[in-house]
Amino acid sequence: MLRQIIFLVCATFSVAIQAEDAELPFKISPVATFNEPWAMTFLPDGRMLVTEKRGRLFVVKQDGGKSRPVEDVPNVDYRGQGGLGDVILHPDFANNELIYLSYAESGVGKVRGAAVARGRLVGEGGKYDLKDVEVIWRQNPKVTDDGHYGHRMAFDADGYLFISSGDRQKFQPAQQMNGNLGKVVRLNADGSVPEDNPFVDRGDVTAQIWSLGHRNPLGLAFDEKGRLWSTEMGPLHGDELNLVVKSSNYGYPIVSEGDHYNGDPIPDHDTRPEFAAPKVAWVPTIAPAGFIIYSGTQFPQWKGNALIAGLASRAIIRVEIDGDSASEAERYDMGARIREVEQGPEGNLWVLEDADGGRLLKLTPPDS
């Protein structure tokens, strides 16, 4: 009887997946599972690096085979929204073996903040280590609470490192210039400050700032023109897709398309034109996380589109970008919270579910 029940459950699950696939413009292939996966990136040979929020990093083959957890990853402060976050490669990884990790770290007492470290990924045969690990950036100041770290990273074509720094649920720091909370920062690859940053003359942590007035930016991506875009969690609704421009102020917490969680209104962007407005705002929320701007050939009709991971929306949201304008085009129900979307070397899509036992999914054209 138990075997019959298992068979029926598996058959029902299979039919559900097939029915789901039939309604989607891609085929879904589960590849592996992880405990609270957060981010991934591709190595030059097609393997992936995948982070788990609790502090583990894996080297993963495209068939789902995993290494043992990479050793000597920095200790993380795992609580709330904190833990191990993003992972990206140095632009010259093939020669210097450097990878970058973002994570939440504890401070003295009950304060904590995001940090970025880099180290050389070395090893083979399923066993890997990080060597010469150094912390190159920290949120300043560290504060109490355990949310809104942001800590997404992206390199531009010139080798500058951009990091999103959330407001840490403190509101006002996003508008204050004596810290880097609620900002997007721009650094050299070693963590030093570029000489042409917009506020470099002010020195100290202010010199890092590229843009301000952000709440919790959980995605960063460059388009083919070299422009930086970000996805940002709003308060009660009001999630955003922003075109991030040097020295611009995006207005939070003074303006937002959402409201405070207690229901108190926040003025909309159109009431304060001095602040940069989002290119897309979502009411109700989609809870955007990681995203890409697609440049591959497997889905040529989507070239130049943003593909956004939706947490609360349990979807992939496709946004068409036309010059400086953008609009949601379609929403693909994935049946689970989606944390990350990445483009593989062949142009297929790779997706991480946000859960204990969250799956790594490969999305391919329906006729592949």
Please provide the spans of the model-predicted regions:
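Beta-propeller blade signature
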Residues: 114-125, 177-190, 244-245
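Sec-dependent signal peptide recognition
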Residues: 1-8
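Conserved blade-ending motifs and adjacent loop-strand segments that build the rim/top face
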Residues: 214, 325-345
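Acidic, Gly/Ser/Thr-rich repeat motifs that build Ca2+-stabilized beta-propeller blades
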Residues: 19-171, 219, 227-230, 234, ...
